[in-house]
């Protein structure tokens, strides 16, 4: 079974319904199979200024995910990535988390993760 780690942008698009039906179907399938997110994605996603009703729905949505915490191994991998690549800290944490858990990173921003040793998947791409 494949494992998928959803990037924050995918959480936002999916939660807000900002995707075509075919893309939503792809993401829904991934969520049913393996709904995992990094702790940083939880912080980024729940840090959005939701109204009270949206906030409750967002918290329920995230509660369905397996939250992957920071570990010493992930921290070391983040340090190694940032020494070699110009990448934002949250992206480095998400990438290192995907590698640590042998997960495919599901993101719309695959270019942010070019040159890193991990598999990415953009559900917005055709096919």
Task: Explain the meaning of each model-derived region.
Residues 1-37, 47-59, 127:
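Short, well-structured N-terminal submotif of metal-dependent ribonuclease cores
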Residues 10-11, 41, 74, 93-94, ...:
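Alpha-helix capping/helix-boundary segments
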Residues 66-108:
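Active-site neighborhoods of divalent-metal-dependent phosphate/nucleic-acid chemistry enzymes
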Residues 3, 95, 100-127:
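Acidic, PIN/NYN-like endoribonuclease modules and their adjacent C-terminal/linker elements
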